[in-house]
């Protein structure tokens, strides 16, 4: 079976829209896209991510750590119930800054002066 691709679109400086599952097959392109961003805050729009596996979860933690080491923040938006359940079971939802929508995240960071 051919793995489903993960499409990553750069919507704006620091804003990446993801479409497709975040799985073992897609970890490298995902991490590369996050590391290429030079904005003070990297916002990952998860609206199009139906699920993730343990490798995808690990890559999110790695991306968050990479951003923190570089003095940047990472936020997630549009996380569906299935993905949120994985976050809750593994308790990683506590380490991610999350917003219901991309608009909410952009507004929060614009008001804080860090978008």
Place the predicted regions along the sequence by residue.
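Amphipathic alpha-helical interaction surfaces in cytosolic regulatory modules
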Residues: 22-96
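Serine/threonine-rich low-complexity intrinsically disordered regions
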Residues: 7, 35-36, 101
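STAS-typified acidic loop motif
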Residues: 2-32
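Conserved catalytic submotifs in the C-terminal HATPase_c
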Residues: 11, 47, 103
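General small-molecule cofactor/ligand-binding pocket signal
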Residues: 9, 77, 99
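A charged, well-structured terminal subsegment
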Residues: 98-115
């Amino acid at each position: 079976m051919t793995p489903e691709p993960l499409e990553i679109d750069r919507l704006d400086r620091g804003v990446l829209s993801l479409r497709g599952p975040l799985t073992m097959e897609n970890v490298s392109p995902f991490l590369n896209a996050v590391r290429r961003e030079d904005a003070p805050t990297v916002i990952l729009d998860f609206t199009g991510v139906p699920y993730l596996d343990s490798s995808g979860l690990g890559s999110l933690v790695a991306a968050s750590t990479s951003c923190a080491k570089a003095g940047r923040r990472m936020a997630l938006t549009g996380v569906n119930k299935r993905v949120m359940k994985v976050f809750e079971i593994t308790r990683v939802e506590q380490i991610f800054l999350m917003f219901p929508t991309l608009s909410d995240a952009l507004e929060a960071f614009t008001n804080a002066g860090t978008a």
